[in-house]
Amino acid sequence: MFSKKIPHTLESDSDITSPLDLWYQERHNDEVSFGLHVKKVLHSVQSPFQRVDVFESTGFGRILTLDGLMMCSDRDEFVYHEMISHVPLLVHPNPKRVLVIGGGDGGTLREVLRHDCVQEAVLCEIDGEVVEAAKQFFPSLAFGLNHPRAKVHIGDGVDFVKKSAAAQFDIIIVDSTDPIGPGVGLFSGEFYKEVKRILTPGGIVMAQCESPWENKFDLAKVYGNLKEAFSSVYSMVGTIPSYPYGYWSWGFASDDVHPFESINFEKARAIEKGTKYYNVDIHKSAFALPNFLKQKLHGVVKNA
């Protein structure tokens, strides 16, 4: 995760390492990595599930990493959180109860609570250390964690869904980590079938589905697991510079709702006055996929 040794050429065959040269590095694979210059380590704790770190970086502000993997940064977190939240909320006819699985940083919850129609937003995060780190170091993300319309449950998302009564959430947002470690169970077909069980009729699931450029995960399988539970699955894409390859995808799944044909334009125009990335044009164009991704997801998602 860290690279402290930055060569400085003094003579033809000598170098030194400055104690001020601290870099965060996320290796995507054996050929590609992403790095940020770190000014200060603000927080580091080993929870029962993962290592939770907060750094102050030079170019991206504060960053939150879990087991060395980038979760969010001050500079571009709004892209992820706005898209995963506003797209489903602005096409559902009457979203009153929303469940966020994962998302302990609070960013998705923050965006959900922009919608006055949401009477209750429940967040289920497996790791309380993530929530505490967000409250301490990311106040602009975490203010929703103490909102009167929000309920925060610390526990396993898979268990929470299994123990929940049927047909009680209008929208479920799966704001998970990668399909490894604590997040692996949140990508299975069995999990999505349980998620569907606790959705109200006409409900929507929105799930993060990894980078289209990443080859270590079978993207067709990731979306195919959603398709095991829902008749209509769409892929949505967006640019997030701090995430692997700078290009991300989400899955929109429902049996009844189209991802952009029923946008509530009045609400969308009001919402986009306070967003940095989301607008109606972006909403619609995010479902236009490049050919290489259409080929990967042909026969799996509706827009491929």
Please tell me what each predicted stretch does.
Residues 65-66:
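A general beta-strand register signal
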Residues 52-62:
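N-terminal glycine-rich anion-binding loops that anchor highly charged ligand groups
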Residues 2-53, 224, 245-304:
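SAM/dcSAM-binding transferase cores
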Residues 4-23, 47, 72-204, 213-223, ...:
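The AdoMet/dcAdoMet-binding core of the Class I SAM-like
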Residues 205-206, 234:
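Structural detector of well-ordered beta-strand residues that form the stable sheet scaffold
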Residues 192-193, 218-240, 251:
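Conserved Class I S-adenosyl-L-methionine
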